[in-house]
Amino acid sequence: VTARRAVLKTFALLPLAGCAATPATPTTTPPPATTTTTTSAAPVKHDALVELEKKFDARLGVYAAGVGTIEHRADERFAFCSTFKGLAAAAVLHRNPMTHLDTVVTYTEADLMKSSTITRQHVQTGMKLRDLCDAAVRHSDGTAGNLLLRALGGPAELTRYLRDLGDDETRMDRVEPDITSATPGDPRDTATPRSLGTDYQRLVLGDALEPAKRDFLKDLLERSVTGAKRIRAGVPQGSKVASKTGTGSYGTANDIAVVWPPGREPILIAIMSSRSSADAKYDEALIAEATAYVVKTLI
């Protein structure tokens, strides 16, 4: 709560001149260009986000949609890292009946990795698909994410699902932990803030999943144990947040969320970031402060 208040206070006095949001667009189609009879209008420049890039020495991508939209490097590619896990769970849900979640998946010690905090406890018994979804989405367990991909038929099958969802940008090529290498210029395992954010918007707020499946995924995202210092730290107190984080090399820190501010319509916030050196540290305050700006602008 202290972190949230500090972040929101930082932006309470920030002027909005030159930073107004652009009109809202439907969740099921790409945002239309604003045009005249001959040329497209110049995109709105969000000076506050440019200043955050300077302050944190980072590249920052933002796509937010509510009563309006905010776009900053919204169509640039970033490594998505663990944010794929919510999408993988959605693909498993989409392709199978809810009863399939009771299927037990077995694995071995060889499948474990550093981030296998939950799956490490169940090597002898295996885990039900519903529990793997929980471990992957709520705890960002790497082995659980990989096992969801395995259940789909591999990374390419997740990409195929996203194409069916209407996402022509996000691509899944590898598995954990390779996806966290986040090498600049490598298109593998990348997305844009717009594409990734729109995916989550369709899954959580749209009809991409049947109601029971949507509710199951939304509940996992709302009860995530990661990201307390990211988007959740930048929203108004009392907001409900359904989010998935991702972290990798080159200071990569991401958070994708649907936020329900008290008494307001939901806002989709997709924030992705990276730095220039492989061993660079990420700073979650960058995401929290970018979130505070987004909320201040769109509410």
Description of each model-found segment:
Residues 65-66, 137-140, 151-152, 175, ...:
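Active-site-proximal beta-strand/loop segments in catalytic clefts of secreted hydrolases
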Residues 59-60, 149-205:
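Mid-domain, small-residue-enriched loop/turn segments at the edges of structured enzyme/sensor domains
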Residues 90-98, 150, 198-205, 292-296:
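Short glycine/serine- and small hydrophobic-enriched flexible loop segments
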Residues 2-15, 20-36, 41-50, 151, ...:
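Structured C-terminal helix/loop/strand segments within mature extracytoplasmic catalytic/sensor domains
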Residues 43-74, 103, 259, 269:
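A short, well-structured edge-of-sheet supersecondary motif
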Residues 78-107, 269:
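Active-site SXXK
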Residues 112-148, 155:
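Conserved catalytic neighborhood of penicillin-recognizing serine enzymes
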